[in-house]
Amino acid sequence: MKAALVYTSTTPELIELVEKEVTKNIGTDAEIISLQDPSILAEVREAGYVTKTAAARLIGMYMEAVAQGADAILNICSSVGEVADSVQTAAAYVGVPIVRIDEDMCKEAVRLGKRVGVLATLATTLEPTKNTISRVARAMGKHVELVDGLIDGAFGLNQEEFRKLLLEAAGKIKDDVDVIVLAQGSMAYVEEDLHEAYGIPVLYSPRFGAIELKKALQEKGMLA
């Protein structure tokens, strides 16, 4: 059994967290294929949207995972999650599901409340995450109010500086939301601090993505 992890952000903290969550869910016997191309996210950040060349390279990574024998693929980056949506027909045709890391997190946010705060350091992640929350809310027959928490100047800071800015940003919206979504997987290490500080449910994508990856493998009969 092989699971492919497709990264467009290669911070060590993110990779460590994702692999920890994946291993916890699918076990240590699974072979992990790690495919990484940070130039994709860099291009998206610079352009402010997912360019056709960035999308093409990401789709190429999916196909490389298939060529390497992956049984399921986890798309790590929320900024390019809509690319994963666009190739679901192809994924079904080759029999290799492509799982978005943030899809079920967004569904859980809608289940937990009508007012959803979205924290992000990149506008290119904030907007796709909001779009996903709105889409799944419609599919669930619910309406949600989205509260932006774009944190300027936080991208690239060390963990302690980032933690401080994130706590400040969450504090500004805490009275206006029922649940907070961390739009980037690399934010996950601040989840406990935010919950303890403000008593609001805080969701991060690697945990949900790993669970969905497990379900995809179970549906193929590869896991009990």
Descriptions of predicted regions:
Residues 1-224:
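Non-catalytic structural scaffold of enzyme domains
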